[in-house]
């Protein structure tokens, strides 16, 4: 299911319960860094609901008291670390709606998440469908479908340019990166 359809379905469920009150972005390590764009977007733009981030273990062992059926938990891990799978289970147990962002449909997170977003994570990389891009897309859809966000069309249009922009940047930076690597290759670590 596409992110747009996922959020449409989630919105219908939340509307029946009084609406969305909070979005939790949960992950650890590099995945936590990758979901930050969605968190930042919602913290900056949302007017009728709030958003925070937790590490997976923190979410499991210091579960927020306000976590309930009016919350969405966006939980991310490429290979579904055990603590991140447990975070999905924790959110499910509290009645929250879970979106498991993961590297394949075979992961433990994909098995326990109510909704699953599989993001691009290999070669060749589709940056418009990376974990960062999917985190943002979830945020854009929540803002659009819940609040009628006026920048939605422009944001969605931008996805068509992401791969081209990244490819150009890689080409532009490669000579400098190679020169730096050659210069520093014998430095002690």
For each feature predicted by the language model, list its residue ranges.
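A short, well-structured juxtamembrane/interface segment
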Residues: 2-19, 168-185
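Short, flexible loop segments at the rims of nucleotide/cofactor-binding pockets, characterized by
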Residues: 2-5, 50-53, 75-78, 164-172
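Internal, active-site/partner-interface "lid" segment
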Residues: 142-182
């Amino acid at each position: 299911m596409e992110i747009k359809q996922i959020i449409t379905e989630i919105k219908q469920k939340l509307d029946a319960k009084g609406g969305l009150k909070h979005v939790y972005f949960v992950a650890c390590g590099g995945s936590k860094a990758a979901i930050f764009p969605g968190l930042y977007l919602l913290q900056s733009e949302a007017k009728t609901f709030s958003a925070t981030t937790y590490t997976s273990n923190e979410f499991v062992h210091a579960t927020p008291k306000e976590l309930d059926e009016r919350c969405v938990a966006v939980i991310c891990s490429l290979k579904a670390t055990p603590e991140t799978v447990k975070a999905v289970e924790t959110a499910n147990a509290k009645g929250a709606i879970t979106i498991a962002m993961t590297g394949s449909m075979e992961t433990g997170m994909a098995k326990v998440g109510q909704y699953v977003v599989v993001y691009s994570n290999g070669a060749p990389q589709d940056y418009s469908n990376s974990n960062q891009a999917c985190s943002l897309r979830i945020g854009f859809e929540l803002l659009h479908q819940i609040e009628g966000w006026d920048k939605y069309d422009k944001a969605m249009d931008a996805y068509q340019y992401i791969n081209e922009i990244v490819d150009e940047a890689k080409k532009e930076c490669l000579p400098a990166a190679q020169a730096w690597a050659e210069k520093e290759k014998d430095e002690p670590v």
